[in-house]
Amino acid sequence: VRMSLTIVESIKSFLKLKIPTIKLFELEWFGGEPLLTKDIVIEITSFAKKMCDAYGVTFVSVMTTNGYLLDFETFEALVQLGVNSFQITFDGDKENHNQYRLSAQSSSLGTFDTIWNNLHNTKKSKEKFAIAIRCHLTAINSGSVRSLLKKIYSTFGNDNRYFIHLKEISALGGKDDDKMCLLSKEEKKCLIQEIKNEFSYLQFVDIGKDYICYAAKPNTFAIRADGTIAKCTVALDCELNNVGRILADGSLDINPQKFLLWSQGFDDLDKLKLDCPYYHIIKKYNS
């Protein structure tokens, strides 16, 4: 779904209302794939950056992208606008990745080479940025991930702008959940530590013990392409995640009961609720 001009203008109105009242504004782009509507990304980011500059507000912007459309010209334009932190995901090396990540143009065309070439080209940039290369882990792909990490080191090992994020895949309620080769909690912990020890010369993203999910934070929300407001970018089909919508004047029409469900961890400091409020909410309402 492409965001309409009406929603774009509503977001700008919201920014006009909000930015003068804060000290830090963080804009994150997530999908779907945000670069399918690159013009809208650039329009809103540019507007937000100018507003922040005008009011002396610190501007931070992050993008999660599959990397397929992140050509060098687009990358440079985004970084110069202030989008200087990216996350790009691989499902192992080329052979393994192309089993799962196929092109929208052809079900027989893998995406690894295009994504890798785009990632490689970012090295040419003289700008300051950070790219987290997310590597998905399953119960059967550790060899493939190791192969990918060797390739990453040979290409980016001397550049401290690139980091590795090891992340196990999870069952999130999709139709193919039962087909996934999932790691147990203990297997995940052991495998990640094993890989970090083996590739200690790489930079790894450290989530830390005090991690708080963005969806648990009262001052964080997502505006979807249709103007719906959500808390979680994973549970997009969950009705409890539809907490309101943005109005034409930039104000937010919020359902307080739904909204507060996501921030319960800040009331009782329950670490499980802070780690993943979605899991807590689904568990509660399905019991």
Q: Locations of the language-model features?
A:
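Conserved residues at the C-terminal ends of beta-strands
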Residues: T89, K167, A235
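Alpha-helix termination/capping residues and helix-transition junctions
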Residues: I19-T21, Q80, T155-N158
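Canonical radical SAM enzyme core domain
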Residues: V1-S13, P34-N96, A104-T114, C135-S147
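Structural preference for beta-strand elements that scaffold enzyme active sites
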Residues: L24-E28, T58-V62, S85-Q87, A130-R134, ...
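Radical SAM enzyme [4Fe-4S]-AdoMet core and its adjacent flexible, acidic
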Residues: E9, E95-P218, A222-D226
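Flexible mid-to-C-terminal extensions adjoining Fe-S/redox cofactors in radical SAM and related proteins
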Residues: T233-S287
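Short Fe-S-cluster ligation motifs
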Residues: S10-F30
